[in-house]
Regions:
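Pocket-lining segment of extracytoplasmic ligand-binding domains
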Residues: 2-92
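Generic structural motif recognizing short loop/turn segments at the entrances and edges of beta-strands
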Residues: 11, 29-31, 111, 140-143
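Solvent-exposed, flexible loop/coil residues
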Residues: 38-41, 45, 64, 117-121, ...
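Secondary-structure end/capping motifs
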Residues: 61-131
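Long, low-complexity C-terminal extensions of enzymes
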Residues: 122-125, 129-152
Length: 152
């Protein structure tokens, strides 16, 4: 909203970060893309841009970790196999997306990478955390632990 209005906290802005549904509609708002961060990250790092992960408390232990990872995977697979039902559910959170855009948006974030987190995606998360530490955004280095069938 701030970029659309040209003001944030009472100060003029002429650039911003477009996320979520805005990726599909920003041009209709009269905005233009200066840099696609996904393309920039891929070109500069040779890895996909990590968009999000699920976390679980370490103290729950490996058995619960694997069980929860399995349940999440089953849920995602169910949604992929029952796409129309999943899209109907997602529509209640869609913030103004029509059916075609909703389908495209969901496909951007729920896909084969969501089911099986490949090594390349793990490396991307590690690179993001490493870069955040090097820039002083993290107080200490963070090394993620991956859980589930595709965990290390």
């Amino acid at each position: 909203p701030a970029v659309r209005q040209g003001v944030w906290n009472g100060r003029p802005v002429n650039a911003g970060l477009v996320i979520h549904e805005g990726q599909l509609s920003f041009t209709e708002e009269g905005l233009s893309c200066l840099v696609d961060l996904g393309q920039w990250w891929k070109a500069s790092r040779g890895l996909p841009l990590p968009l999000g992960v699920n976390g679980i408390r370490r103290s729950l232990g490996p058995k619960i970790h694997k069980e929860v990872a399995g349940l999440i995977r089953q849920s995602i697979v169910y949604g992929l196999e029952h796409r129309e039902e999943a899209l109907d559910y997602a529509a209640s959170f869609a913030r103004g997306l029509d059916g075609e855009r909703l389908s495209k948006f969901v496909a951007m974030y729920v896909n084969k990478w969501t089911v099986r987190f490949p090594e390349e995606a793990k490396q991307a998360v590690e690179e993001l955390l490493r870069g955040a530490y090097q820039l002083g955004l993290l107080e200490r280095p963070l090394v993620p632990e991956f859980v589930g069938e595709s965990g290390r």
